[in-house]
Amino acid sequence: LLIKRGIKKGDKVAILMMNCLEWLPIYFGVLKTGALAVPLNFRYSSDEIEYCVNLAEADVLVFGDAFIGRVEEIAERISKGRLLIYVGEGCPSFADDYNSLSANCSSMPPRIVLSDDDDAAIYFSSGTTGFPKAILHKHRSLVHSCKVEQYHHGQQKDDVFLCIPPLYHTGA
């Protein structure tokens, strides 16, 4: 989906969604393309969304139905040179529909070489003293976090795990 839309290694894809079935495939799909995932706090105001999308220099904003109003408020200002992809039913006119775009995508993994030292994600601080600050993570950092969580919870391959924290948070 993203590669067909011109997204390549080093590009940035902001994700503004509540925890949902599509969240993880989108997040890991972004990482597999070599692009950087930029998860956004679902509590952000329109101004904070605009600030973070611009600061991260996101090439794409993927957003869910809970954010139509907030994204619509800033769509004209942030859409120039940036893809807006909507995940949900009833796609707004200012965005592309995720379901339509993903309907004919290949299930084959992209042939993109990634290393532990490649940039992987940009997370944002809580912004308690002003606008949120961007924090760059390498693939090594994300893999290490996964290993720590797996060890901490003692998860096995076939376990079912209920994730309560928001997925935009590094601790989720």
Residue ranges of predicted features:
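Conserved structural elements of the adenylate-forming
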Residues: A121, I135-Q156, F161-Y168
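Short acidic active-site motifs
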Residues: D47-E48, R70
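Conserved AMP-binding/adenylate-forming
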Residues: L1-Y44, P166
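ANL superfamily adenylate-forming
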Residues: I68-D116
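Active-site charged/polar residues at nucleotide-handling catalytic sites that mediate phosphoryl
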Residues: A56-E57
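Conserved pre-ATP/AMP-binding loop-to-beta segment of ANL
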Residues: A103-F124, F131, G154-V160
